[in-house]
Structure formats: structure tokens, C-alpha cells
């Protein structure tokens, strides 16, 4: 694999004393994702569920503070697909929650280049967007949050979107409360280490 140079982002973050924020989106279905399980010998495990394709879409960001390297998780859940307007709403939420400059690293998806985001960037001098290289999800630490959530929720079977929303909210709060888990998501990515 060729080496990926994200050094300019790190240098700009240090120069601006900016928070680094890694953003990604994901979706969760009412149909459970089946993982490995166990059962007594000769008894096949059966997972009962309602066969509905309802889903919850989520956008989150792992923010790393510039001085103490403290990690924070920000997340918003939606009942519909995430479009450019929802990404802009999330970015405005980050700007309200985090003081100082933000360098936001995200994939180069179409929703991240929408008119509402271009307008937000033109009005906000402390927000800087940097795309990850194409086809490189392994560089985004926020993928670790989604992987952890999907493993935690595997074999579960919420009956309604509200139940799924409640379960997701509880698990996201648990992840957000764990510095070790958030740092682990960053360390498991293929990014060069920047923790002291």
C-alpha cells in the first residue's frame, strides 16, 4: 500500500490549535445483522424478527482536542437518509459545541460537497474540510465507532424504529463515555499515530 500523507492536516491543526474531527455516516436496519452465536448441540439458534426494512441513519464525529488530545464523540440520528443538509446541520452543531478552529476529515461522498456545505464554509472561517483519499475507509477512525456499534447490536431484534433509536442512543452514550474506546478507534485506523 502506498503511504498516505496527511501531514499538512496535522501541521495546520497544530498551527491553528484546531480540533481534528473525523466524520462518517452509517445506517442501522430493523433486520438484525447476524453474527456468530452458540446453542446447545443439535439445536439451531433461531432469531425471530419482523421483516421490515425501516432504518435509522446516523452521522458521528470523533473530535480530538489540540492540547490534551482528549477525545469526544458527537452523534446525530435521523429517521431518513442523510443528505447534504443533514451534514451541514451536524457541522453547525460541531461549531456550536467546540470552540476554536475545526479541521474536519471526511470521505469525498456527494453529500459532503452539497450547496448547503459550500455555503456554510463560505460563512465560517474556523471550519476547514479535508477529504480522505478516495476509497480509503480504513483511514477514518469513525469507522471503528460504527464497527463497534454494529457488533454490539448484532443478533438484537428491535421491533420498532423507536426501540432501535433508544438502543442506538444508549450504546452511543457508552462509547462517548469511554476515552479508551475512542482512542482505540483512532489507533486501529491506518492513520499515523499522533497521540503523545
Enumerate the predicted regions with their spans:
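RNase H-like two-metal-ion nuclease catalytic core shared by retroviral integrases
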Residues: 107-108, 115, 130-154
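Short beta-strand segments
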Residues: 22-23, 103-106, 131-133, 186
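C-terminal anion-handling pockets and recognition modules
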Residues: 17-20, 142-196
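Short, solvent-exposed loop/turn segments at secondary-structure junctions
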Residues: 26-29, 63-67, 109-112, 135-137, ...
Amino acid at each position: 500500500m502506498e503511504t498516505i500523507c496527511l501531514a499538512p492536516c496535522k501541521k495546520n491543526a497544530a498551527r491553528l490549535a484546531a480540533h481534528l474531527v473525523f466524520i462518517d455516516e452509517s445506517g442501522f436496519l430493523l433486520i438484525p445483522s447476524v453474527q456468530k452465536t452458540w446453542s446447545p448441540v443439535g439445536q439451531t439458534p433461531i432469531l425471530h424478527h419482523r421483516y421490515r426494512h425501516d432504518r435509522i441513519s446516523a452521522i458521528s464525529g470523533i473530535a480530538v482536542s489540540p492540547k490534551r488530545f482528549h477525545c469526544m464523540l458527537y452523534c446525530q440520528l435521523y429517521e431518513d437518509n442523510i443528505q447534504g443538509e443533514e451534514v451541514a446541520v451536524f457541522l453547525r452543531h460541531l461549531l456550536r459545541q467546540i470552540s476554536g478552529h475545526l479541521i474536519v476529515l471526511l470521505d469525498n461522498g456527494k453529500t459532503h460537497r452539497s450547496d448547503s456545505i459550500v455555503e456554510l464554509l463560505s460563512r465560517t472561517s474556523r471550519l476547514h474540510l479535508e477529504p480522505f483519499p478516495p476509497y480509503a475507509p480504513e483511514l477514518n477512525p469513525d469507522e471503528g465507532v460504527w464497527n463497534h456499534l454494529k457488533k454490539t447490536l448484532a443478533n438484537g431484534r428491535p421491533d420498532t424504529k423507536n426501540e432501535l433509536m433508544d438502543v442506538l442512543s444508549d450504546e452511543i452514550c457508552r462509547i462517548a463515555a469511554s476515552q479508551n474506546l475512542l482512542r482505540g478507534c483512532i489507533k486501529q485506523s491506518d492513520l499515523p499515530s499522533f497521540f503523545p
